[in-house]
Amino acid sequence: MAEKKGKTVTVEQIGSPIRRPAEQRATLIGLGLNKMHRRSTLEDTPAVRGMIAKLPHLVRVVDEA
């Protein structure tokens, strides 16, 4: 499978989804996160940036490459 060359962003979950709205939980799953301190590396797209912006209290950007 061909690997895409492009910018990536690594995010880490820093907050618990317990007692959060279902929409925020779904956004975490969309980012590939579901447990505390897990990291996920994703393509740096406007959609991913929008999901990160919706959850500033639950995720942090670790690395932008």
UniProtKB/Swiss-Prot annotation:
Pfam families in alphabetical order: Ribosomal_L30
SUPFAM superfamilies xrefs: Ribosomal protein L30p/L7e
Keywords of the record: Ribonucleoprotein, Ribosomal protein
Lineage of producing organism: Bacteria, Pseudomonadati, Pseudomonadota, Alphaproteobacteria, Hyphomicrobiales
Disulphide connectivity of cysteines: none
Membership in a protein family: Belongs to the universal ribosomal protein uL30 family.
Domain of life, per lineage: Bacteria
GO CC annotations on file: cytosolic large ribosomal subunit
GO terms, biological process: translation
Single GO MF annotation: structural constituent of ribosome
Keyword ATP-binding in annotation: no
Keyword Ribosomal protein applies: yes
Name assigned to this protein: Large ribosomal subunit protein uL30
Self-association state and partner proteins as the record states: Part of the 50S ribosomal subunit.
